[in-house]
Amino acid sequence: MASESLHNLDSPKSSRIPNFFKMSISERISELHRRGLLTSDDVHQLVSRDHQLDSAVADKMIENVLGVFGLPLGVALNFLINNRDYVIPLVVEEPSIVAGLSGAARIARLGGGFYSDPVDTLLIGQVQSVVDGDASKKAQLLLAEKQEILSLANSLHPKMVARGGGANDIEVFHHKAEEDGREMVVMHLLVDTRDAMGANMVNTMCEGVAGLVEKITNGKVFLRILSNLTDRAIARARVRIPVANLEGKGFTGQSVRDGIVLANDLALADPY
C-alpha cells in the first residue's frame, strides 16, 4: 500500500483527517476550522444555524410555500484534486454515501489523487421556427444576422457578459416535420454560463431573441428553450490507482481490477 507521507495528515488544509467520523459535530467543525478548511464566518453560520433557510425567504423563492425541509449536511474527506486538498460538502439523506465517497477518495489519494481538466461551460438554447419556402435559405439568413442576434441576447444579461460569459455563437439546422413535412429552422444559441448553472439565463435569452428570429426567417417561432443535451458542458477527470491499492476484504488487487473492467464492459454494451 502506498505511503501517505507525501501529503502530511496534519498539514494545513489536508483533507485526510483520521477518525473524523468519531468526533462530535462541534469537534468536526473546530477541526476543519483549525486546518483552514472553514472560515470563521463558516463556523459562525454552522454553529448559529443562520445557514438554514428561513420560511419568509422560501416564500419568495417558489409558490405555495408551507415551510422548509431540512436534510443532513456532511463532508466527504480525502479528496486530492490537481494536487490540492478539498473537503466536499454533501446534503444527502441516505447513509453510506459520504463514507463511500471518502473511502474511494482515500484510495485515489494513495495514487496521487484526481486530475481534472478545465470544464467546458457552453449550454445550448434552441429556437424553433416553422417556415414556408426554402428552409436552407432561411438558415443562411439567420447566420448572416449572427451578430445582431448575439448582441440582443447578451443585452439581456450584461452581468454575465461582464464576467466573460454570455452568448458567443449560433448554429442553424433545418429539418422536416415527420407528420406533415413542414419545414423547421432550428437555431442553437451557444451560451457560456461561466460558473452559473445557467438554465434560466439561456431560456431568457431564447425568449428574448425569438421575435428577431421570426422577423429574419419570416416564420413562426414555437419552442424557445434550453436543450437537455449538454454535450458542450462536459467535466473531465482522471485517476490512476495502483493495483496493489485495490486489495482488501479478502480480494486481491488483480481480482478487483478485473471486476471493474467487467463492469465497464457491461456499461459500454448495455445502456441500462
Where are these regions (language model features)?
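Structural signal for hydrophobic packing residues in well-ordered secondary-structure cores
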Residues: 36, 105-112, 146-160, 206-221, ...
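Anaerobic metallocofactor- and corrinoid-dependent redox/one-carbon enzyme cores
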Residues: 49-67, 72-76, 92, 98-99, ...
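Small-residue-rich
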Residues: 60-61, 68-182, 187-190
